[in-house]
Curated annotation (Swiss-Prot):
Residues 119-203 are annotated as: Disordered. It comes from the Bacteria. Residues 142-169 have a biased composition (Acidic residues). Monomer. Binds 30S ribosomal subunits, but not 50S ribosomal subunits or 70S ribosomes. It comes from Frankia alni (strain DSM 45986 / CECT 9034 / ACN14a). It is found in: Cytoplasm. The keyword Signal does not apply. This is Ribosome-binding factor A. The gene is rbfA. Keywords: Cytoplasm, Ribosome biogenesis. GO terms for cellular component: cytosol. One of several proteins that assist in the late maturation steps of the functional core of the 30S ribosomal subunit. Associates with free 30S ribosomal subunits (but not with 30S subunits that are part of 70S ribosomes or polysomes). Required for efficient processing of 16S rRNA. May interact with the 5'-terminal helix region of 16S rRNA. GO terms for molecular function: ribosomal small subunit binding.
Length: 203
């Protein structure tokens, strides 16, 4: 009967045994700096896949793979003695490309960041080739003079309106004075009109 929990526990133990054996027990000169990254055991505890990485170039990886294949029987025997299981799982060694892929991805991200930084610096120092607003027509001296002339005309018109109002007010006051003089000659008292009031008030 499959027992996933037991398979995980056995995988951890196999990883420890194989890593220790590669460090102390295997004397193959082809074996490089090998690191056991993970071990997966099937639920029936029959097969174990050992994932590993090798520090170095492609030649170092190839030589280490050959050394592991040669030492597979020895390593399986040590696993059987260390774990005490009835049937020692077969060992299959697989080069773990995940760290290499992760490093490659980090390198790509680093290159992209450097490129973005250079582009940002270029944009910061860039200046527009033309005017900021190419559709904005600059004002001319003649247009400025026309605006000043229009302002002067408006001021003169306002001054004329004020004089007209003053003249109308003077005519109204003069009419009241004439009425008072005519009334006095006729022996009557004439009162000036007061807006909103009674002209006879105060007699």
């Amino acid at each position: 009967m499959a027992d996933p929990a037991r398979a995980r526990k056995l995988a951890v133990r196999i990883r420890e045994v194989v890593a220790s054996a590669l460090e102390r027990g295997v004397k193959d000169p082809r074996l490089g700096m090998v690191t056991v990254t993970e071990v997966r055991v099937t639920p029936d505890l029959v097969d174990a896949t050992v994932f590993y990485t090798v520090y170095g170039d492609e030649d170092a990886r190839r030589a280490s793979a050959e050394a592991l294949e040669s030492a597979r029987g020895l390593l399986r025997s040590q696993v059987g003695r260390a774990t005490g299981v009835k049937v020692t799982p077969t060992l299959t060694f697989v080069h773990d490309r995940l760290p290499d892929d992760a490093k490659h991805l980090e390198d790509l991200i680093s290159v992209a960041r450097e490129r973005d930084a250079r582009l940002a610096e270029v944009r910061r120092d860039a200046r527009p080739a033309g005017d900021e607003d190419p559709y904005r027509r600059p004002r001319t001296v003649d247009e400025d003079d026309e605006d000043e002339d229009e302002d002067l005309v408006d001021e003169f018109d306002e001054f004329d309106r004020v004089e007209e109002l003053d003249a109308d007010a003077g005519d109204a006051l003069g009419g009241d004075a004439g009425a008072r003089e005519a009334g006095a000659s006729a022996g009557r008292q004439v009162y000036p009109a007061s807006p909103g009031g009674d002209p006879t008030a105060g007699r």
